[in-house]
Amino acid sequence: MEHKALRVIISGGGTGGHIFPAVSIAGKLKELNPETEILFVGANGKMEMEKVPAAGYKIVGLPITGLQRQLTLKNIINDLSVPFRVVSSISKARRIIKEFKPQVAIGVGGYASAPLLMAATKMGIPSLIQEQNGFAGLTNKKLGGKVQCICVAYEGMERFFPADKIVMTGNPIRSVFVPCTQEMKEEGVKEYGLDPAKKHIFVVGGSLGSSKFNQSMRKWISEGCPGSEGVDVLWQCGKYYKAGIDQFMAEETAKNPALKDTVRYSDFIGRMDLAYAAADVVISRSGASSVSELCAAHKAVVFIPSPNVAEDHQTHNAMALVRKDAAMIVKDADAMEKMMPTALELLRKPEKIASLEENAGKMALPDAARKIADEIYKLV
């Protein structure tokens, strides 16, 4: 296939789970042809307005916001303004399209994706949706009938989209996430100061940390780390929670000096690939990117889906693996009692771990960005 220079608009963002796939797709398009021009469209005030320029791409913001779930005066005022912001955003999106003259429009989810794709499809611009999750959101479901191609990462998405438009590509992830080797494991154990003679659990509640994960860890630690013989734990607690965890750990270590040999914690883990490699069992939320990374790394994982997401999509993501015996799941409501005991019990079952690793690897979809880029070229 010839990879001629293109003019491409990529819209969406709001969370890293939308932004990273978008940047990955852009990077692959530029790799195939450095002359390709790419313009991002995001939502004013959202993280894409910082993250995308940091990745080297131009971005334009729309005045779009979403409906707020909590009932406060500020949120009520925001919600009343949403229809006007949508109209204004669609109008601005039309102007952006007229000026940039894209050959293809791509939506990756998030507030800005909807008005941009609405405008693009009405203006006859070939369009593509990249749906990261196993349960499609309302906006993408509505847009699915208007775009030409829908790239997905899970089976069964014909529940939400026209079957003839669906292409199974997987979610773009960083190239460092590969099947973990013994050499990588040894490097990860050394990187994070773990005991090579022990088994290892990695607890990660997302880049910002998880209050529920942290509460569950504090409960387990305050009870004396039951079941931790021959085990150490690497725990990403999140920057927001770090000060409180520092104080808690100082108090607990004073009572139990051996704690410092059982639990290592940090506000942020920079080398996730090495942390995954070091771990015999991972405890994780089940956002789309995390699921794809863990499959690529062939890891045994206990998923605890976040309840604070639209359409409960993290549960759908996790269950896609659980049904294939490629992961385990604990409900968020049960995490305080079951998070650590479930992981520790799994750690004592090497045959189960091996089975989970093998089946997770079977669900990996490598080179997703290239597959999506190929679909983009088919539209022009």
Language-model segment annotations:
Residues A5-T15, E35-F84, K239-Y241, D332-A333:
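Conserved nucleotide-sugar phosphate-binding/catalytic loop shared by glycosyltransferases and other
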Residues I10, L39, M47, K58, ...:
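Active-site-proximal region of nucleotide-activated glycan assembly enzymes
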Residues Q70, E183-K190, L194-V282, T315-A318, ...:
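Donor-nucleotide binding loops and adjacent catalytic segments primarily
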Residues L71-V104:
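An amphipathic, basic-hydrophobic alpha-helix
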Residues K92-A105, A112-L128, K141-G145:
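Glycosyltransferases and closely related glycan-assembly transferases
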Residues P102-V104, I269, D273-S290, K299-A300:
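Acidic donor-binding loop of glycosyltransferase active sites
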Residues K352-P366:
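A short, well-ordered alpha-helix in the C-terminal region of glycosyltransferases
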Residues L365-V380:
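C-terminal alpha-helical cap of glycosyltransferases
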